[in-house]
């Protein structure tokens, strides 16, 4: 059987944290709390040990991309326009992609004070619920066919080539695309694209999302841990929705604790686990970097593509 990680350099946490540089600016606990997702656990030590060395690595890739653009200009004998450095971040539901994305956005802004650093989630490219209903695939929400891939690829192409674009906004509170609300992306220096599908091959397409990425990260963890984190997040969402009748999750607050847990476990088994095993995890080795989380959400192993 082929070793999936044969093309990766495997690095322990203790070795990885040595790549931290003392002159880097860290974050305060308050800043971390402001970007942390619901049940994700991250502290200043994790930033120092894992994410500041990661910023150093991204700086290397960014510098190499700039050098390549400059060299192409010399070869073609014409100036090349600066293009945004795009970072793709993937992984399962509830694994902590959003926290990692927001943390990198903040650290990149600190590292490159004059740079514009934007972040988008591919949730905004899900078809609206009514379209999914019309297609008969509402129960497949989050699976590859539930995304408007031509729109997503057109967005990446436009941004990569210096254009401005307005994209849809998804709300987890209403569990749908927000009508009339858009996010404008206008010539960023860095763009972070986060979503479960960022490494997947679109059906009948000649372009792939990964064609536009300058760096890519997969957030990995054992399935049993991801399931635990998903169930914990579901309970947190119910608590937040208890007093908000407009929240999608409010309807489930009428359930008993046992009924709610049963629903969450059913959703995990029939949707999220199937999606992870069939569509998300198989794309893992397309990433440039794999960050593996242990039981406590701490990164315990790093795989860097050779």
Swiss-Prot record:
Associated pathway: Cofactor biosynthesis; coenzyme A biosynthesis; CoA from (R)-pantothenate: step 1/5
Record's catalysed reaction(s): (R)-pantothenate + ATP = (R)-4'-phosphopantothenate + ADP + H(+)
Domain of life: Bacteria
GO cellular component annotations of the record: cytoplasm
Keyword Nucleotide-binding appears in the UniProt entry: yes
UniProt GO BP: coenzyme A biosynthetic process
Keyword Kinase: yes
Disulfide bond sites: none
Location of this chain's protein in the cell: Cytoplasm
Short name of one Pfam family: PRK
Protein keywords: ATP-binding, Coenzyme A biosynthesis, Cytoplasm, Kinase, Nucleotide-binding, Transferase
Residues at which ATP binds: 91-98
Listed GO MF terms: ATP binding; pantothenate kinase activity
Documented EC number(s): 2.7.1.33
InterPro entries: P-loop_NTPase, PanK, PRK/URK
Protein family (similarity comment): Belongs to the prokaryotic pantothenate kinase family.
NCBIfam families, sorted: panK_bact
Name of the protein this chain belongs to: Pantothenate kinase
């Amino acid at each position: 059987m082929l070793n999936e990680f044969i093309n990766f350099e495997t690095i322990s946490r203790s070795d990885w944290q040595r790549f931290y540089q003392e002159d880097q600016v860290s974050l305060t606990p308050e800043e971390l709390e402001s970007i942390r997702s619901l049940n994700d656990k991250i502290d200043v030590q994790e930033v120092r040990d894992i994410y500041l060395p990661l910023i150093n690595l991204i700086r290397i890739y960014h510098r190499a991309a700039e050098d390549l653009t400059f060299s192409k200009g010399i070869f073609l004998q014409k100036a090349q326009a600066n293009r945004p450095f795009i970072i793709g971040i993937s992984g399962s539901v509830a694994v902590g992609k959003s926290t990692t994305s927001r943390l990198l956005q903040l650290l990149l802004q600190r590292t490159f004070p004059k740079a514009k650093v934007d972040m988008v989630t591919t949730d905004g490219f899900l078809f609206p619920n009514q379209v999914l209903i019309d297609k008969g695939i509402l129960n497949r929400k989050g699976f590859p066919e539930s995304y408007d891939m031509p729109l997503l690829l057109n967005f990446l192409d436009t941004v990569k080539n210096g254009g401005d674009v307005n994209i849809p906004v998804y709300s987890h509170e209403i569990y749908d695309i927000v009508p009339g609300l858009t996010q404008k992306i206008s010539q960023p220096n860095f763009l972070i694209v986060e979503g479960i599908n960022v490494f997947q091959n679109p059906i009948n397409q000649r372009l792939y999302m990964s064609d536009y990425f300058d760096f890519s990260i997969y957030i990995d963890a054992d399935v049993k841990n991801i399931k635990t984190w998903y169930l914990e997040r579901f309970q947190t969402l119910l608590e937040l929705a208890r007093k908000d009748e407009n929240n999608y999750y409010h309807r489930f607050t009428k359930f008993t604790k046992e009924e709610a847990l049963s629903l969450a476990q059913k959703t995990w088994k029939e949707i999220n686990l199937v999606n992870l095993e069939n569509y998300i995890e198989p794309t893992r080795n397309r990433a440039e970097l794999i960050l593996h989380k242990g039981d406590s959400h701490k990164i315990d192993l790093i795989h860097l593509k050779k």
